[in-house]
Amino acid sequence: METKINGEELPYVVCKLNKGESVVTENGGMSWMDDGISMKTTTNGGIMKGLGRALAGESIFMNVYTAEKDDVEIAFASSFPGQILEFDLKEGETIIAQKRAFLCAEPTVDISMHFRKRIGAGFFGGEGFIMQKFQGPGRVFLELDGAIYKRELADGQKLKVDNGYVAVMTSGVDLNIETVKGCLLYTSPSPRDPKT
């Protein structure tokens, strides 16, 4: 399968398939496709896997698109402004992503829900307790809102990030939440013009 990510504000990925190659997406994920591609709806791993995906913010059912001839194209577009990132996962390699990040993948990628180890990180973090887990082998495409800044951490290195800004991480990253000491945050109605 050949792929190309196009567009800037509202990107899309075009997958060029040869006969027998497939790509998986959730219901409503496909934008357009050539003639010569068949579609099958499945739970992609059974009803329990489907329910797990539903808890992670995705659809219970997945659509599998398979090329019936060579050199056919199918496109998947982001549903909001941001970026599409491609991850080529090796056998057993795992990434964890925010809910609703999944766009499409090769059918060999295992898609499931991921519970944060520390329950406080889930309840007080902006992305919630349940995230998505993708395990290789295969390529997966994620749609993420806004601009992306990639940061690689050394062993034992800590990085403080405002809650809700963690989009994707490897399975070896330990995500926790800290409180800011000595601060009290509150809001009240305020005028639009500071002079009034």
PLM feature segments, named:
Residues 83-175:
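Surface-exposed interaction/gating patches
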Residues 186-191:
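Conserved small/polar residues in nucleotide/adenosyl-binding loops
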